[in-house]
Amino acid sequence: MKNNILMSVLLTVSLSAALPLSAASHVDVVKMRTENRVNPLGIGTSTPRFSWQITSDRKGVVQTSYQILVASSREKLDRNEADLWDSGERNSDEQLWIPYQGKALLSGAQAYWKVRITTNKGKSEWTEPQLFTIGLLGETKWSGTWIGLEDLQPGEQKGMHTRLAARYIRKDFAAKGKVKRAVAYVAGLGVYEFYVNGQRMGGSQALQPVPTDYRKTIYYNTFDVTSLLTEKNAIAIKLGNGRMFPMRLEKAYKTPFFGYPKCRINVKVEYENGKTETWATNNTWKLSFDGPIRSNNEYDGEEYDARREQALKGWTQAGFDDSQWQKAERCAIPDGTLMAQPMTGMVEKKFGHPVSLKHRHDTLIVDFGQNMAGWIGFQVRGRQGDTIRVKYAEKLQADGSLYLDNFRNALSEDIYICNGRENGKSWRPAFSYHGFRYAAITGMKNARKEDFTAYTVSDEMATIGHIETSDTILNKVLKNAWWGIYGNYKGMPVDCPQRNERQPWLGDRTVGSLGESFVFDNERLYSKWMHDICDAQRSDGNIPDVAPAFWNYYTDDVTWPAALPFTCDMLYHQFGNKQPIIDSYPSIRKWINHILAEYTDKNGIITKDKYGDWCVPPEKLELIHSQDPKRKTDGKLIATAYMIRCLQLAEQFANLQGLKEEAKAWADRRNGMIDAFNRQFLTNKAGTSRRPGHVLYPDSIYYGNNTSTANLLALSFGIAPQ
């Protein structure tokens, strides 16, 4: 798609990471991607897609051809020995989502690729090699079992404020020779930290894996652990709740219960002598729930008792005495399909120290000067048994205390119980994040600004758009928008990071995803979310208002589920990725047909809409044209307008796949609904002239009760007659 290639070029403004080409060409190939990721490990397809961008200090540079080489080793690729695939020189300006078409890539395969392009200004050199590996493609490629504990333990509870201690699981393994390559595949529900010989894997990654409906999809992560293995090895994992063991369980009809934390791990080891083996989870692994993390709850926070650290000292290293630990239970196999995580997921980034500390009675109020989503780390000093509490908030009351009404019943508090030996040790939670600018700290004496550090925790993605104006207020609005969007990327787009909700509402992103895409490279997040929405669809075609369906809100709405076709369209036009359209089209078709069959009246109008013009902003007097004092837009008008747009998108999606008959059927249905919409909602007052040069009387043509919403939808969705 030429428009997407042009966008790729325009968005690439930095040459700092460029790969050098011939001096005469003045062209650089940058941002090489496999499945839109940099050197990804364990991708979930045997036909990956390659992308790159070009930059130049000249104008009018256009790619005219490319050649891709893929090899099974770096050495072969350096010799231009493409034993997996040589695309040959292809006359094309395409730079996005070029599909691999070489030899079959099997589970665990490792490959290297590079590209050379020709432009109207000359030919480039070969780029530097890029790496990708294939994950475990299917259940039959996995060994071992799911392990964990399948019940509550002493001190744990369901109900309004669920409590569950972290699960600590480990096993030692002896290598049977010199290791050539070792790869770990880790599925840990709900969230986990994974260790090999004492080394925490994943770097800055946090709260892995990204959340899904575990009844449908379970993501695993892949780690290359070759350099960490020795003769004796320890494989260990710490499991938190995430969304697996939900934060609230007092309403069974509303919140699905997925089960208790569990894991499945495969470490595939390849030796220099050609032999292989798999270290896999089973009931010979050992488990403890008596570690320091006594409770972890996304709404309520994390409780950490450092007095329990000593008993687990060295638990992630080989040779640890786990004889007093219990055997891990073999758990029921989750219903969800194991799949490679298609995105990096959340990462922790250091924000900085507070801008102010203020004492209020026995409480210290810290202000970081910026609302964000993440957690606070601090330097621990105290006597054994001292309790440090960190209570989070987004704003303060007039008296300087925390304002907490907007948190509702989310406790949002991290608790640390000292062992008396910390002496300034740094601590921060592992399995709970918060929305905050402020925090109230109790239990710390002689605290300083440098004792506290805020960290953001959100999905890893680049900022690709920046706007700065001469207006300071507008600049502040834009800055706040950046922080608001970024703080709500949590492996899925959520509505808020602070209160007892944090749900992936579809309606928020029906239009929001498009606006966000001008600021963030959010393709991986939203492609993953399309899969979530399809997972959440019921057999009758109903798509819920929240997906993954962590709340059972199947209201049969139109405007909220419209996020599926709307966002698929965004991914195609903004990032050139048509795969979400292809994958989601059956669900879109099923949903549209369901709504049309169940909620179309005899006049051709959609009768069902739950939310209407949700949270409509106040209007200035000069913008009010409606004579209706309530100015509430008819839900039928909104639902029908959105369905008309969805039918238009369905037609486009069908044409994109060559489904001409389906495309025509969608177009016919859309045209009929447009006629019905205009008959039902369009007012054309007598005396109105449609002749050129004649005056059009104010408010003589309008939709519904003449609200801004009613008129704008008709214009935006191409419903208003010419």
Language model features with spans:
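Core register positions within helices of long alpha-helical scaffolds
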Residues: T567-M570, C646-L649, F653, F717
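Thiamine diphosphate
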Residues: N552-H573
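Extracellular/oxidizing-compartment recognition motifs
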Residues: S25-Q110, K114-R499, G507-D508, R524-S527, ...
